[in-house]
Amino acid sequence: MQVDKTSFTPLYKQLFFIICQQIQNGSLPLGSQLPTQKEIARSYNVSLIVVKQAWSELINAGIISSQRGSGSVVCSVPEGVSYGHTFRGITRDLQDASVAIENRILEIAPRRARDAQADGLSLPAQHHYLYISRIRCLNNRPFNHEKIYLDLSFFPGLELTPQALEHTSLYSLLNVTSDSAIEKVEAILPSADLCEKLQIAANKPLLSVARQTFQAGKDSPFEYCRYYVLSEYFGEIHYH
């Protein structure tokens, strides 16, 4: 297994996952010594900086221990790892990966719960919502289309502008921290509308995700979202 240099996921996270897989499948047994960082860099054709970042993640996760002069040793078997996508949102994920992202805001408007039914979302009927439609691009290439419904009972008087959303993470603007989400993911072929928005062919598979996002300590979602994403980005979520 090699790192994918065309992927949006940082190389060090890919390398972290690869090593975790090798530990889980027994290629690197518990107590075994890992190759040196220079050997890893040569094997995977990555820089030593990338390897050091992956090593730091592995050490912080308690998966390996490293002593100067004696190398690195596998000290625990990871139960599961995930990389590429978190509950913080795609903008923050990619900013943390030092990837420049462009937000193209298509619409911001008040909506009612029944308006979300066309997007396959079931929202509490008595609440009011702020709807956001946007496209995300990397290097001028669209990769994600989102239809977001924000429950205004969490954000009384909320006003958002396209200009603010183009340059700042939505969660930063809302001043919220999410600690959990419920997602239903399915593979689809794009509609004509999605082909146009994402500039893709009709036979290009997409992942369609229905998501409910929760604030820490809250029982009801503050955000309901239907988003479509190219598998090159989201496909790196493996398991927990």
Curated annotation (Swiss-Prot):
Q: Which residues bind DNA?
A: 37-56
Q: Which InterPro entries does the record cross-reference, listed alphabetically? A: Bact_HTH_transcr_reg, Chorismate_lyase_/UTRA_dom_sf, Tscrpt_reg_HTH_GntR, UTRA, WH-like_DNA-bd_sf, WH_DNA-bd_sf
Phenotype caused by lack of the gene:
Null mutant gains the ability to efficiently use exogenous aminoimidazole riboside (AIRs) as a source of thiamine.
Q: Which UniProt keywords apply?
A: DNA-binding, Repressor, Transcription, Transcription regulation
Which Pfam family is one of this chain's hits? GntR
**Record-annotated HTH gntR-type domain positions:** 9-77
Name used for this protein in its record: HTH-type transcriptional repressor STM4068
Which species does the entry assign this protein to? Salmonella typhimurium (strain LT2 / SGSC1412 / ATCC 700720)
Name a GO molecular-function annotation.
DNA binding
Determine the domain of life of the protein's source: Bacteria
State any GO BP term from the record: negative regulation of DNA-templated transcription
Task: Kindly give the CDD domains that the UniProt entry links to this protein.
Answer: WHTH_GntR
**Cystine bridges:** none
Q: Where is the signal peptide?
A: none
Please give the PANTHER family that the UniProt record associates with this protein. Answer: MANNOSYL-D-GLYCERATE TRANSPORT/METABOLISM SYSTEM REPRESSOR MNGR-RELATED, MANNOSYL-D-GLYCERATE TRANSPORT_METABOLISM SYSTEM REPRESSOR MNGR-RELATED
Q: Which PROSITE patterns match?
A: HTH_GNTR
Q: What this chain does, per the record?
A: Represses the expression of the STM4065-STM4067 operon.
